[in-house]
Amino acid sequence: MKQQNNPQALREKYIRELNGANNSALRAKELADDLFSLDLTVYSQNFSFRSIVYNLFAMSEIDENISMHPEQLQIVSKINENAATIISAPTSFGKTFCIFEYIVKYKPKNVVLIVPTLALVDEYFKKIIKKYKNKFSHYKIHTSLNEEKIYDFNSFNIFILTHDRVVQETNYHIIEKIDFLVIDEVYKLETDMQNDRVLVLNMAYYYLSKKASKYVLLAPFIKEVNDIDKLEKSPFFYGSNYSPVVNDVRTFPILQEQDRVSECKRILKSLNEEEKTLIYFPTVSSMYKYISTVIALEPKKLKFLDHEVLFFIEWAKEEIHEEWCLITALERGYLIHNGQIPMGTRMFQLDYYEQSNLFNKLLCTSTLLEGVNTTAKNIIITKPSRISNSPGDHFSAFDFFNLVGRTGRLHQHYIGDAYYIKSPSDPEYRKADAVKSIRFEVTDASKDIDIQKGEVEKYQDVVEFLKKLNITKEDYLANIGSKARFDTVIDLYNAYAMNKIKLLAQLQAHIEDGRVGRLRLVEILYKICEQKEKVKLESNLINTLLSKKKASYKKSSR
């Protein structure tokens, strides 16, 4: 497409010019009229008469030092005009800021913000509500729901919650009234029968959108939502590719899988150490391998670390293990983020990444990138996949460019750089392929959605299963079915039945013969708790810890 027919391509041309200028402020002053015409008002600032006039009218209600760009103003206006709105725009657009701008400007009484992760709950609270506390002082902030607590819906409330917490039957009824509902990352509403979380998010939307006087759904890279007229309140769709920063992808070919580690090391060494850099790994094991084979060989930087980090390192060495990968990373100026790291430890690392100049490199898996808006100049994609290293688990173009979009931040970087380490079997990605049409499962043909709506009688296998458990469909939805698909529940039940037989047999063996060892019983119980088959190592460790002469965790793990 020619640039004159593609405003974003023109924007990128001018952003690159600012980035390459010896004096970007002087160059912005020279280009002020062009920048203003392209809606790059954040760069034209007060360098032209039109910009000065515009900024007076576009001043943020939250922060008078910020002027909203024209498309942000449009979004706030569309939210106000429509009972329901779906907004698709790049990560750097500033969608979340628009939401809080609307809240401050129009003051809806009961606000519910639904986000994918607890990390985002914390981010919204710290970076916006706490930072601009004078603007939200009349709101009571809730980051969890308590069935025993009485909430006053006649006063001003903001609930910031994960969808897991609101979809449960009891929690859903706690929220009596919603004046303004926002659900983030709604591309995850797209039908995926293999994913239980898709069902959870769809039901959160289904229940809460009916209660809400007004709602907004947020996502990147969505071209359209199929059957949008079937959704609650027939939402208005606003799609934009506006971005005030440029995301570049640089491809670094490798010939063999084992070259990924050395290439990542080489790229990282070539980058400015003062720039924030994310290093993405598809699995926790590949991350830990990089730490043990590359980072562990780097010199320690203990004399540069503050006392809080040093205290944590000493505590972790004593209570966990001196060779824990996190300790190895911290001592050398790296942070790590994955689902195996305790939540509190993840949170304090994110704070250091955002606020400290000592920690500019963060190793992560998809647990971070799906749930936190970090600031990064660079990202190294060591392999374009998640969960697995197998070729069949490659990223889609949507996944890939959603990752790339995590680089570059307004007021910090004109250009964000993604470094793609590509083997011969890895895909080529085109940005045009990332923009997709989706259909929410709640409007699709779905057995699980029917069950959630109480339409159980349609399915004989469901009816028979409820009879076997001797429970009503209401009991099923309240206590079992709110977080899992029916097929998942059946698999869990069958595993439970099998483990129950084994457990009772082992208990009977203990009753009949007191000399029977405890290890087999520990193995069965651990399998039940962790839903894993291979548990020999863990069972031996637990059995040791349960012995009368208790050893420390560190000694037991040896």
Region spans (language model):
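N-terminal helicase ATP-binding lobe
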Residues: M1-R558
